[in-house]
């Protein structure tokens, strides 16, 4: 049996930066100040549980923080302006781990609003990134999730529209919706394609290639990870059996009956250790050889850690 690894897979630069910021902050203030994180630092169960064991307190709102001497970290998904202002009012020291690519969307949305545009956001309802983007502008943003949403859209001025997109959606994810928007509203403007999240597109391109050369795909990632679920969807859409797993303990050995080639990928918020443990498990339980898929992309993107850390 052969294991073929997707390339790239796992951590993107924005997730690595956020996790590094939290780890460095925790080390710096250990036993001195309580470290809080608003929501999950990234959408991965292993990462969150590991930091909880080290003493990090994850909160769902700033009201839960009674210790104003603590340090609050904003997650990689970003927050609204109101949340930022609330932390300042309470006098809480904040370290912002928002992904720079998410910050870029915040700035784009504000720029469009300042130029008088009515805004449309392509994204998923209730995703923390979407909440943050909506909270970065003063006027309401209309959320579009499906083609039907585009057809049902009611706007004030069809000639004065702009759109932005959630970063964890790739060009492929948004292509049809953007095309439908442009068909209905030919004057609509939006960000350059090069502004999309490189990591989302790269991982999706890789898993599509992987699905062509294997019998089954294991996607390492958490159930609440948007990009991990999309990797799963891309495999099943190509007629390949695929499973989204938090770690090796979720594997069912019956999955491998009649399988010769197993593909493995990981969502952008899944750490390498989870893939490594999965490979070790498969080595122990199956006779396997391991290779990396041909034609993959090596990512060299790095984001700076803020000086405050």
UniProtKB/Swiss-Prot annotation:
Q: Quote the record's binding site residues for dimethylallyl diphosphate.
A: 43, 77, 127, 225-227, 269
The EC designation for this entry is 1.17.7.4
Query: What's one GO BP annotation on this UniProt entry?
Result: terpenoid biosynthetic process
Q: Which reaction does it catalyse?
A: isopentenyl diphosphate + 2 oxidized [2Fe-2S]-[ferredoxin] + H2O = (2E)-4-hydroxy-3-methylbut-2-enyl diphosphate + 2 reduced [2Fe-2S]-[ferredoxin] + 2 H(+); dimethylallyl diphosphate + 2 oxidized [2Fe-2S]-[ferredoxin] + H2O = (2E)-4-hydroxy-3-methylbut-2-enyl diphosphate + 2 reduced [2Fe-2S]-[ferredoxin] + 2 H(+)
Q: Which residues bind (2E)-4-hydroxy-3-methylbut-2-enyl diphosphate?
A: 43, 77, 127, 167, 225-227, 269
Q: Which residues form the active site?
A: 129
Kindly report, in one word, the top-level EC class recorded for this enzyme. Answer: oxidoreductase
Q: Does the keyword 4Fe-4S apply?
A: yes
Q: Which residues bind [4Fe-4S] cluster?
A: 12, 99, 197
Query: Which cofactors does this gene product need?
Result: [4Fe-4S] cluster
Keywords, in A-Z order: 4Fe-4S, Iron, Iron-sulfur, Isoprene biosynthesis, Metal-binding, Oxidoreductase
Residues bound to isopentenyl diphosphate = 43, 77, 127, 225-227, 269
> What is written in the cofactor note of this entry?
Binds 1 [4Fe-4S] cluster per subunit.
Q: Does this entry carry the keyword Zinc?
A: no
An example Pfam family from this entry, by short name, is: LYTB
Q: Name one GO molecular function term.
A: 4 iron, 4 sulfur cluster binding
* Biological or metabolic pathway of the protein: Isoprenoid biosynthesis; dimethylallyl diphosphate biosynthesis; dimethylallyl diphosphate from (2E)-4-hydroxy-3-methylbutenyl diphosphate: step 1/1; Isoprenoid biosynthesis; isopentenyl diphosphate biosynthesis via DXP pathway; isopentenyl diphosphate from 1-deoxy-D-xylulose 5-phosphate: step 6/6
Q: Can you tell me which family this protein belongs to?
A: Belongs to the IspH family.
* Physiological role: Catalyzes the conversion of 1-hydroxy-2-methyl-2-(E)-butenyl 4-diphosphate (HMBPP) into a mixture of isopentenyl diphosphate (IPP) and dimethylallyl diphosphate (DMAPP). Acts in the terminal step of the DOXP/MEP pathway for isoprenoid precursor biosynthesis.
Protein name in UniProt: 4-hydroxy-3-methylbut-2-enyl diphosphate reductase
Give the species this sequence originates from: Wolbachia pipientis wMel
